[in-house]
Amino acid sequence: MKGGGTCDGGHHQAKGCRGPVAGIVQFENVGLRYGQGEEVLCDLSFSLTSGDFYFVTGASGAGKTSLLKMLYLAQRPTRGAIRLFGTDVVTLPRARIPGFRRRIGVVFQDFRLVPHLSVADNIALPLRIAGVLEDEVRDAVSEMLAWVGLTNRAEARPPTLSGGEQQRVAIARAVIGRPEILVADEPTGNVDEAMADRLLQLFASLNGLGTTLVIATHDMQLLSRVRSAQIMHIDAGRLLDPTGLLRHPPGRHA
């Protein structure tokens, strides 16, 4: 899913995601354009509170993925200010970006697992890249395998896994480093409803440990399953007032 759209029309801020209080994430008048095209995200201003649960909703092409890319520092904005953990990351030297990225877990829509590595080795990658001692890596991987229910698949290769199993591997890999923020792009888009519920339970348990969750989805039924979550609805590159979105939720994958 590639963020897109234009930025015509009125400008509304998402309720519950805007305020003067400093948060773990702050966007101020952020805009993004690719190349010489029109802006795909326009005048985004919001603050996310540490430990909260957020859904980013909107139609395909609304700009959800583009927003997530800026959150996990894969994309710099064209204009505006972004602060993560109290630091201006727009002007952050590239040499410091990896240190910030280690504080942010990412679950990609297409999983991005390494096909020739086992499930256990895929999950271990972030810790090994960070130079963690191997004994600690093994213990952490064992814990993650149990958490996502894949202990008996530790030596399997990703191509032999179902879509739901691959997604659980991706989640375990994203959280093994105990990130302060977890960003997930359509994490339930390739699984059935039963697996979607299981993944949501994993996210909720992680949020219960204090991790800030930002999940992009077009599955409206997910919104009603996490009553405490706040909603950031994007339409044509702008944040809109989500009031009433849950009163008459459309069907799954609306």
Segments from the language model and where they lie:
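ABC ATPase NBD coupling module
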Residues: 89-105, 206-208
